[in-house]
């Protein structure tokens, strides 16, 4: 690591840039006053005129010529100049010793001797550093890497070069010094002095190109040739050429000044002793006379011997032996040698002030531009317009901070515009202005006009001040700079860049002026020791980064062509030019400057700096014109005059007391400024001064009375311009002029400065503002402040009222973002403070303060609640807080947090409610947990929420796992054992959740346990189980997803019972029988019409359901079945069936009597309804032997063999196939092996017992009557005759009365009552009740017994009788005794004719029905179909009832379902599907329907 170089420059922040409108641009002073509050905070600002404002360049370019100043960049910077001065002193010190200073290299870099010397001094000096071995620390401080023994090298260099100089400065005798060139490496470079001491404080000789200087000039000039390397001309060194500020012709080589090349270290060669020195260091004296020997003696030893070793001082000619010096010199020095006394004299000479030197060449504007452009393009090796401003800025500050590179430039500064013309057009000037540019002549932004405009107080300065009231011109080149300075008299300045490359500015605000001065004095005290007013000389610059590092606020800007830069009072500013350009500047002073102007004069007096004009003279001139002054200016003048008169009165009183008695009126305004300066402080005298006759033309101000001369003060004369009596009227005149304004201003000031309860209402401020407008008071700070305060107060009042009335909502918002129009609480707090800080009082302020207190209370309550744990009980409290917070029209950051907390609390409430056993007895369900977790995920994280979420998640995971396991167990195939399920339930215990599958599993286990207990009770009890219970257990077992061990055995028993029932059903039931097996086996419960209706309804239902079997359980039969199932044993079941038997016989008796009675001749034959069709009897009829009802032969199937004497039973009475008894007994025995009780088994057992009992009784009856099947051969009395006779009375079967009555009825009924029976029936007349009961019970039995047929045949063959009526009746009821196939074709035709007549009668009868009666429901129509089958339909095969399920339509669509609609043909009474015949429900309800067949037949009959 090597020594640290200067840090890269960091540009300061930009200053304000203003772009006024045309309206604002019209009045420059009004605009400057407007921007002053902003711009004075940065010291400088930039103003861009409107784009169309482009004044012509009016300067006479051909006549303009100037001599620029030479600027060596590294001499400008204060700290760099200090280093150079130090090196020059070291070089001079060794040069006087006859030695040449060579700067050593360390780590391949030139050693910074200044820094090394300063660090050693700061550490306590050479001896202390050596004693405490601090050289390594110093090396590290200088930026060298540790561990390379750099410290020892630094010590050697310090001891050899700097230590002797420091000893000399401390006053130690240096008679013997080691030469700095001894024991040095060849790589050490010789130091060439910068000749700063030779270029100090040149006498003020005004050149012909500038006005009398008002800033420090250089005191002398020298041949300013720029030196190139020896033996080479400037023309042959391009690198050197681009570092030169001008092309100066080389003069004498001995006067050349070395220049450092940029890329390389200094090429310094050891200088040879000057050849022109004729006096040798060794004094070769010819043998003198004896009397002259004593003249050349050594001042140390006092002897004159060893003349060849005697040295003669080149300064004082004193002699010293080389061996007398300590330590002795081995050789005679080759160069000049000074003795210690002369060395002290030379080195102790005071350092003269630094100043710029003038170049030796006079430039025209063209020539300077060529030189400037050539320099910049050569330096950056690119065209001038392509060099970035940032690069130039960084390179400039690098160059001013280095001592290794010497770059010289030239700057045409302070060129008087009065001689060569301004860049702006002037009236009467040589530049001819175009007509369209004449507006620029009177423009306020024309710098020739600005300083002398009415708002500028400089108009009252009588003399023309070049640079202040008259513009100065500036011609710059790249790197040419203007150093840190403030304007004369701390005035404003304005600079306009007419054309060229930008000018970079740096500025510090006026309040930081003293801070900047203190920093510069601190960092470069050596410069200020010799030049206290250094900053007034414009010769010193300092890096802005350095100033900013010490707390000085610095701002920058780049001024481009056509832009103004304004500097404000006492604002330090500096800068440099980016390239060739032309600028113009002037000063001006406004009313607000006047207090600063007087302070500046006092400041100048302390620094002994001359004034550019007399401030007191300017004030008095304005006071003399009081009637013409602006009221604001008059007020300012009055205040300034008051201070001035007070000060002058005190000074004159002081002088009078000191003894000055002579007074004399003196017209100081007739003298030039340089002729009336104080000889001490150089202040321009005006009001008064002291003179003495001993020094004519010399005066002092009243502050420096003792500095005039040594004469007694009584000899002094007080010269005065005005008496005090003259000054007071002048001040009063100004006061009267400003009195009204002052009164207004005082009132404004009073209300503006009122405190607390003394503040006035805003209406007072409005009144004052209106008054200023009425009186046309000029724009000034006070008026602007009043206007600003009034505007602020009105705005604050409006905002405060809005906040007070700002309840813009009744419910709190859901959004979290801040409304653009809402204030934050801190902003509202600041706003309230602003209200109370306003100079005026607002009625809304206390109300808003109260509102703010409420808001703060709300915030405190909210913060306390938010700091607590999330609680479900806090929902109502949070809601009330949110409701309260929503009333404030302020952005409250607690509101979104409260909303989040509310959601959290509600969520916790939901969790607690879900877990509450009272509110939710079932427990927390999985869906509730998932829903709560989903809601919880969207909540703002909180420890309470996180804990509850973790608990819910854990519970959900466990619950889901248990549910899955429970579901797997419930769906397991084959099912799991009960033990597995119970072990699973032990895991569920203690889980606070509603688990449906687990509950189902629990229910399954409970049901399984109950089932096993029931199964165990069935097996252990010893009694035969009931089939219903057994079947129910099997069904329940199938619904229990558990492996049940007894189930297999029960299923086998149930299967056996089902097989038995199927066998029994096949044995008993007729095909398509409407009766169940139990109904067949049990005694009959219902008889007659009710059973008939139910049977027909059942048959119709079978038709509608397309043949699907549906066994309708009768209520009474259900009771029987329930009683049988509930019976505990067979005995109780037999008792129940015995009761049903008695009911059966009783019902049959009633039914038979009813049916017999309606067939008696006395009956109303017109209303007689018989058969399954419930129509009148007609034609061939069949009479059931059991129920004794009559049936049309066409409606039911008759006996298969009419000649075979077999009892015919109607379809309602024929309930089963009546299997033989042996077959039934086998069924019963097979059932007993199964050991299961079922109602069918009990009924079968009872049937068998009943059948056996009946057989026994029949046999007893037959035996008791002596009947035998072999006595029926016709010999003797027939068994039936004996049976009939034994009854003791006779009964005659008469159907429908006597023949005569039947004939009448037949006639009246149009022969519809003519009917007869086709088979022989048992005559009931004379039949004993016992035999009838036996016969009825035998027919009721569903068992085929030979006794039944035997008894029937015996009862059927009764004795012949000669009774006429009976014979007639028999002839009427019974057809002729012929064979079965003896039915003639006539009888068949008669039957068909009768059928057709019935159809006609039915058609006529149905036409009388209402339309509502014609359209019946599906169930009613099914009954009508079963009861209204026509003879033609029933004449077909009645063997199958399945025909009733078919639609007669040719293309039947075969629809299915309970909702299929039917329609009946009104002719043939056949039923059709509505969809098959294309009839809608509405059409069928309103119109008669006739099928296609009937329609065709009907039309044929009509034909």
Swiss-Prot record:
Annotated localization: Nucleus
Q: Please tell me which top-level EC class this enzyme sits in.
A: oxidoreductase
Q: Name the cofactor(s) required for activity, per the record.
A: Fe(2+)
Point to the regions of Polar residues compositional bias: 202-211
Just give the chief location class.
Answer: nucleus
- JmjC domain span: 439-605
Give GO BP annotations, semicolon-separated: chromatin remodeling; regulation of DNA-templated transcription
Region Disordered, annotated ranges: 202-223, 268-287, 1362-1381, 1403-1442
Q: Basic and acidic residues: which segments have biased composition?
A: 268-278
What are the residue boundaries of the JmjN domain, all occurrences included? 15-56
Q: Does the keyword Ribosomal protein apply?
A: no
Report if keyword Iron is assigned.
yes
EC nos = 1.14.11.67
How is the co-factor bound, per the entry? Answer: Binds 1 Fe(2+) ion per subunit.
Report the PROSITE patterns cross-referenced here: ARID (PS51011), JMJC (PS51184), JMJN (PS51183), ZF_PHD_1 (PS01359), ZF_PHD_2 (PS50016)
**Coiled-coil intervals:** none
Protein name (database record) = Lysine-specific demethylase 5B-B
Q: What organism does the record attribute this protein to?
A: Danio rerio
């Amino acid at each position: 690591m090597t020594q640290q170089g200067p840090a890269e420059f960091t540009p300061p922040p930009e200053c304000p840039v203003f772009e006024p409108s045309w309206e604002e641009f019209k009045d420059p002073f009004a605009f400057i006053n407007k921007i002053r509050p902003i711009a004075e905070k940065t010291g400088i600002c930039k103003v861009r005129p409107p784009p169309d404002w482009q004044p012509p360049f009016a300067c006479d370019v051909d006549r303009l010529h100037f001599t620029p100043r030479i600027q060596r960049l590294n001499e400008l910077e204060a700290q760099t100049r200090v280093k150079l001065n130090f090196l020059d002193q070291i070089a001079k010190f060794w040069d006087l010793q006859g030695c040449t200073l060579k700067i050593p290299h360390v780590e391949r870099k030139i050693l910074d001797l200044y820094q090394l010397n300063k660090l050693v001094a700061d550490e306590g000096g050479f001896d202390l550093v050596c004693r405490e071995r601090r050289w390594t620390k110093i090396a590290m401080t200088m930026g060298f890497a540790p561990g390379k023994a750099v410290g020892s090298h630094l010590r050697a260099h310090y001891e050899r070069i700097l230590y002797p100089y420091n000893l000399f400065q401390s006053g130690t005798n240096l008679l013997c010094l080691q030469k700095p060139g001894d024991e040095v490496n060849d790589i050490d470079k010789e130091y060439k002095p910068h000749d700063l001491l030779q270029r100090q404080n040149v006498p003020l000789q005004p050149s012909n190109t500038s006005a009398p200087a008002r800033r420090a000039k250089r005191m002398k000039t020298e041949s300013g040739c720029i030196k190139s390397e020896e033996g080479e001309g400037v023309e042959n060194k391009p690198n050197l050429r681009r570092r030169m500020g001008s092309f100066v012709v080389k003069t004498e080589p001995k006067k050349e000044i070395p220049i450092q090349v940029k890329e390389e270290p200094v090429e310094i060669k050891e200088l040879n002793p000057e050849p022109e020195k004729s006096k040798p260091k060794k004094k070769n004296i010819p043998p003198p006379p004896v009397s002259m020997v004593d003249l050349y003696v050594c001042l140390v030893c006092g002897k004159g011997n060893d003349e060849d070793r005697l040295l003669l001082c080149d300064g004082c000619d004193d002699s010293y032996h080389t061996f007398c010096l300590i330590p002795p010199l081995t050789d005679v020095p080759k160069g000049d040698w000074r003795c210690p006394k002369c060395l002290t004299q030379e080195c102790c000479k005071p350092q003269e002030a630094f100043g710029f030197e003038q170049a030796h060449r006079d430039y025209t504007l063209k020539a300077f531009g060529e030189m400037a452009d050539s320099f910049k393009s050569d330096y950056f090796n690119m065209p001038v317009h392509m060099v970035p401003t940032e690069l130039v800025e960084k390179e400039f500050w690098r160059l001013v901070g280095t001592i290794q590179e010497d770059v010289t430039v030239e700057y045409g500064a302070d060129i008087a515009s009065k001689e060569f013309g301004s860049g702006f057009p002037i009236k009467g000037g040589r530049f001819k202005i175009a007509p369209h540019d004449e507006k620029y002549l009177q423009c306020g932004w024309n710098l020739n006009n600005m300083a002398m405009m009415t708002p500028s107080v400089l108009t009252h300065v009588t003399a023309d001040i070049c640079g202040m009231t008259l513009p100065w011109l500036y011609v710059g080149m790249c790197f040419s700079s203007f150093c840190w300075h403030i304007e004369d008299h701390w005035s404003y300045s304005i600079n306009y860049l007419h054309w060229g490359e930008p000018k970079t500015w740096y500025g510090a605000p006026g309040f930081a002026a003293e801070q900047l001065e203190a920093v510069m004095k601190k960092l470069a005290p050596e410069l200020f020791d010799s030049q206290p007013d250094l900053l007034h000389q414009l010769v010193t610059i300092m890096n802005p980064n350095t100033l900013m590092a010490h707390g000085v606020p610095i701002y920058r800007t780049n001024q481009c062509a056509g832009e103004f830069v304004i500097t404000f009072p006492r604002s330090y500013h500096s800068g440099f030019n980016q390239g060739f350009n032309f600028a113009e500047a002037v000063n001006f002073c406004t009313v607000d400057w006047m207090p600063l102007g007087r302070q500046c004069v006092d400041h100048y007096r302390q620094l002994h700096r001359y004034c550019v004009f007399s401030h007191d003279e300017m004030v008095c001139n304005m006071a003399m014109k009081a009637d013409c002054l602006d009221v604001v200016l008059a007020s300012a003048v009055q205040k300034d005059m008051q201070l001035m008169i007070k000060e002058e009165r005190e000074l004159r009183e002081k002088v009078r007391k000191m003894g000055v008695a002579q007074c004399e009126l003196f017209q100081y305004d007739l003298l030039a400024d340089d002729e009336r300066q104080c000889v001490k402080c150089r202040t321009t005298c005006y009001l008064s001064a002291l003179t003495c006759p001993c020094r004519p033309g010399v005066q002092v101000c009243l502050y420096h009375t003792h500095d005039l001369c040594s004469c007694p003060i009584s000899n002094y004369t007080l010269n005065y311009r005005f008496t005090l009596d003259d000054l007071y009227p002048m001040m009063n005149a100004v006061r009267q002029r400003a009195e009204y304004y002052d009164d207004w201003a005082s009132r404004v000031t009073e209300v503006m400065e009122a405190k607390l309860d003394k503040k006035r209402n805003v209406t007072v401020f409005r009144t004052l503002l209106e008054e200023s407008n009425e009186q046309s008071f000029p724009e000034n700070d006070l008026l602007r402040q009043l206007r600003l305060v009034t505007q602020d107060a009105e705005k604050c009042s409006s905002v405060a009222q809005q906040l007070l009335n700002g309840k813009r909502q009744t419910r709190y918002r859901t959004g979290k973002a801040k409304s653009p129009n809402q204030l934050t609480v801190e902003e509202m707090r600041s706003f309230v403070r602003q209200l109370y800080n306003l100079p005026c009082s607002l009625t809304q302020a206390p109300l808003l303060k109260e509102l703010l207190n409420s808001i703060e209370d709300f915030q405190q309550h909210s913060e306390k609640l938010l700091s607590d744990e999330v609680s479900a009980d806090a929902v109502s409290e949070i809601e009330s807080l949110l409701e309260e917070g929503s009333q404030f029209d302020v952005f409250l950051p607690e509101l979104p947090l409260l909303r989040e907390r509310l959601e959290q609390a509600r969520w916790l409430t939901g969790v607690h409610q879900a877990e509450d056993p009272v509110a939710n007895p079932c427990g927390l369900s999985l869906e509730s947990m998932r829903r709560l977790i989903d809601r919880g995920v969207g909540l703002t994280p909180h420890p309470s929420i996180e804990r509850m979420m973790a608990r819910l998640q854990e519970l959900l995971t466990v619950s889901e796992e248990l549910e899955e396991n429970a579901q797997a167990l419930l769906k397991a195939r084959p099912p799991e054992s009960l033990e597995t399920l119970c072990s699973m339930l032990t895991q569920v215990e203690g889980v606070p959740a509603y688990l449906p599958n687990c509950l189902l599993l629990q229910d399954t286990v409970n049901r399984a346990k109950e089932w096993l207990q029931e199964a165990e009770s069935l097996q252990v009890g010893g009694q035969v189980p009931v089939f219903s219970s057994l079947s129910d257990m099997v069904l329940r077992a199938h619904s229990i997803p558990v492996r049940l061990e007894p189930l297999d055995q029960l299923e086998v028993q149930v299967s056996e019972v089902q097989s038995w029932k199927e066998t029994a059903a096949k044995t008993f039931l007729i095909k398509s029988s409407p009766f169940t097996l139990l109904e067949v086996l049990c005694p009959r419960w219902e008889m007659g019409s009710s059973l008939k209706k139910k049977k027909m309804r059942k048959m119709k239902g079978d038709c509608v359901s397309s043949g699907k079997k549906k066994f309708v359980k009768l209520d009474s039969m259900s009771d029987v079945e329930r009683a049988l199932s509930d019976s505990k044993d067979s005995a109780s079941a037999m008792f129940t069936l015995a009761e049903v038997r008695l009911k059966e016989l009783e019902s049959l008796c009633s039914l038979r009597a009813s049916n017999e009675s309606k067939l008696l001749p006395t009956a109303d034959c017109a209303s007689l309804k018989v058969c399954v069709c419930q129509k009148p009897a007609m034609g061939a009829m069949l009479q059931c032997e059991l129920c004794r009802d009559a049936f049309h032969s066409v409606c039911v199937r008759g006996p298969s063999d009419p000649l075979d004497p077999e009892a015919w039973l109607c379809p309602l009475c024929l309930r089963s196939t009546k299997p033989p008894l042996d077959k039934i007994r086998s069924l019963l025995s097979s059932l007993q092996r199964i050991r299961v009780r079922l109602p069918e088994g009990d009924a079968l057992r009872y049937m068998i017992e009943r059948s056996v009992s009946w057989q026994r009784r029949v046999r007893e009856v037959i035996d008791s009557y002596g009947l035998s099947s072999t006595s029926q051969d016709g010999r003797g009395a027939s068994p039936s005759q004996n049976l009939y006779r034994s009854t003791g009375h006779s009964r005659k079967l008469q159907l429908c009365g006597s023949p005569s009555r039947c004939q009448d009825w037949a006639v009246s009924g149009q022969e519809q009552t003519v009917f007869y029976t086709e088979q022989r029936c048992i005559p009931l007349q004379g039949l004993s009740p016992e035999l009838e009961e036996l016969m009825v019970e035998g027919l009721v039995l569903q068992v085929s017994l030979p006794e039944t047929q035997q008894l029937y045949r015996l009862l059927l063959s009764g004795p012949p009788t000669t009774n006429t009526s009976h014979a007639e009746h028999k002839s009427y009821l019974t057809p002729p005794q012929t064979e079965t196939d003896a039915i003639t074709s006539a009888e068949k035709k008669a039957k068909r004719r009768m059928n057709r007549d019935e159809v006609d009668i039915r058609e006529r009868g149905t036409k009388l029905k209402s339309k509502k009666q014609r359209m019946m429901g599906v169930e009613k129509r099914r009954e009508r179909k079963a009861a209204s089958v026509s003879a033609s339909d029933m004449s077909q095969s009645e063997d199958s009832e399945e025909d009733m399920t078919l639609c007669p339509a040719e293309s039947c669509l075969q629809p299915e379902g309970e909702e299929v609609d039917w329609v009946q043909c009104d002719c043939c009474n056949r039923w059709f599907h509505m969809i098959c015949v294309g009839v809608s429900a509405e059409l069928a309800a309103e119109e008669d329907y006739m099928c296609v067949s009937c329609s065709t037949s009907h039309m044929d009959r009509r034909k």
